């Protein structure tokens, strides 16, 4: 299952490059969540259905859906459009590193020596690629990808406060539904105004 997960996650950046050649990042995100919501809804039904959300927990789901699934993924797609798929994937692989740091700061989770070594190695790897690489790098793409990492990590740490109350499938489904609510009008704006004004623009900063 881990190998399947790695394969699917890695292929996202390759598939996204093709999709972003014909659609803007917001539209790609909308299509992605439309499919995901249908799949997760069916899976949740098979698992027995949804549990009622406690009123005080909605703020965490809004953070997950708004910042995590909506803004963060649009930035990720924007970065993928402006960078090579491998470089975008490399920057976004910093998510576990930033999540560990934020969890230590805000949730008081302990960072082990193993975590420290992993963080240092990851940062050195990214520095070598970004700071010493010979290829030309689009800094707007880098900033989009880094912004995506920060927002996704913040949303991931925030949702941990209620992770023990609900099935992960339900949490993901509700977060994606919230993201889709934002995505639909944003995609309309992107296609009606942005694409019409700049027909060749398919990414942030293009």
Spans of model-derived segments:
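Glycine-/small-residue-enriched transmembrane alpha-helix faces in small-molecule transporters
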Residues: 1-27, 136-161, 182-183, 201-206
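Specific transmembrane alpha-helical segments of multi-pass solute transporters/efflux pumps
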Residues: 7-8, 12-13, 41-92, 128, ...
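Hydrophobic residues within membrane-embedded alpha-helical segments of Major Facilitator Superfamily
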Residues: 7-8, 13-15, 35, 67-71, ...
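Membrane-interface helix termini and inter-helical loops of multi-pass transporters
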Residues: 14-25, 49-50, 78-85, 127-140, ...
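Membrane-interface helix caps of multi-pass small-molecule transporters
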Residues: 18, 42-45, 74, 78, ...
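Structural motif at transmembrane-helix junctions in multi-pass transporters
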Residues: 20-28, 73-94, 164-170
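Hydrophobic alpha-helical transmembrane segments of multi-pass integral membrane proteins
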Residues: 27-42, 46, 63, 115-121, ...
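Hydrophobic transmembrane alpha-helices of multi-pass small-molecule transport proteins
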Residues: 40, 62, 102, 111-131, ...
């Amino acid at each position: 299952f881990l190998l399947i997960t790695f394969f699917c996650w890695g292929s996202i950046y390759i598939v996204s490059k093709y999709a972003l050649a014909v659609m803007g990042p917001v539209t790609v995100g909308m299509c992605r969540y439309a499919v995901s919501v249908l799949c997760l809804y069916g899976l949740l039904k098979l698992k027995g259905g949804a549990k009622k959300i406690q009123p005080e927990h909605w703020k965490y789901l809004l953070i997950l859906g708004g910042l995590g699934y909506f803004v963060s993924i649009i930035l990720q797609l924007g970065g993928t459009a402006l960078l090579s798929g491998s470089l975008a994937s490399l920057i976004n692989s910093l998510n576990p590193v930033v999540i560990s740091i934020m969890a230590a700061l805000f949730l008081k989770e302990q960072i082990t020596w193993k975590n420290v070594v992993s963080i240092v190695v990851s940062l050195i790897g990214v520095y070598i690629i970004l700071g010493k690489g010979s290829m030309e790098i689009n800094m707007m793409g880098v900033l989009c990808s880094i912004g995506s990492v920060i927002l996704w990590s913040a949303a991931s740490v925030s949702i941990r406060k209620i992770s023990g109350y609900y099935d992960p499938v339900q949490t993901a489904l509700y977060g994606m539904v919230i993201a889709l609510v934002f995505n639909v009008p944003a995609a309309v704006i992107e296609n009606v105004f942005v694409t019409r004004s700049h027909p060749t623009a398919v990414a942030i900063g293009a």
